[in-house]
């Protein structure tokens, strides 16, 4: 017998917002009777940008900026129809990208 599984991947720049959203999803899934594996922290992607400080001269003087993209993975095992309805109605924060597989 094949079991159904919902895999949810969350991405955000702010890890506090990400953990809060993951907690809401876990709480909703457990309340409706599904089993939850996670949240599993995935590697943080760091994009670094180097720019010149001066617009004209002084090439040696540079400034670095970085953007950190935090990721979490959630597996919802054996979801019920109530779980699907509750997850569809769930309103998460604006800064969190949700990808469902």
Swiss-Prot record:
Q: Entry's SMART domains? A: Ribosomal_S10 (SM01403)
- This protein's species is Anaeromyxobacter sp. (strain Fw109-5)
Q: What does this protein do?
A: Involved in the binding of tRNA to the ribosomes.
The alphabetical list of record keywords is: Ribonucleoprotein, Ribosomal protein
Record note on quaternary structure: Part of the 30S ribosomal subunit.
Could you tell me which SUPFAM superfamilies the record lists for this protein? Ribosomal protein S10 (SSF54999)
Q: A single GO CC term, please? A: ribosome
- Name this polypeptide is given: Small ribosomal subunit protein uS10
Q: Which family does it belong to?
A: Belongs to the universal ribosomal protein uS10 family.
Instruction: Write down a Pfam family by its short name.
Output: Ribosomal_S10
Its GO biological process terms? translation
Cite the InterPro entries for this sequence. Ribosomal_uS10, Ribosomal_uS10_CS, Ribosomal_uS10_dom, Ribosomal_uS10_dom_sf
Q: Which GO terms describe its molecular function?
A: structural constituent of ribosome; tRNA binding
The lineage, from the top, is: Bacteria, Pseudomonadati, Myxococcota, Myxococcia, Myxococcales
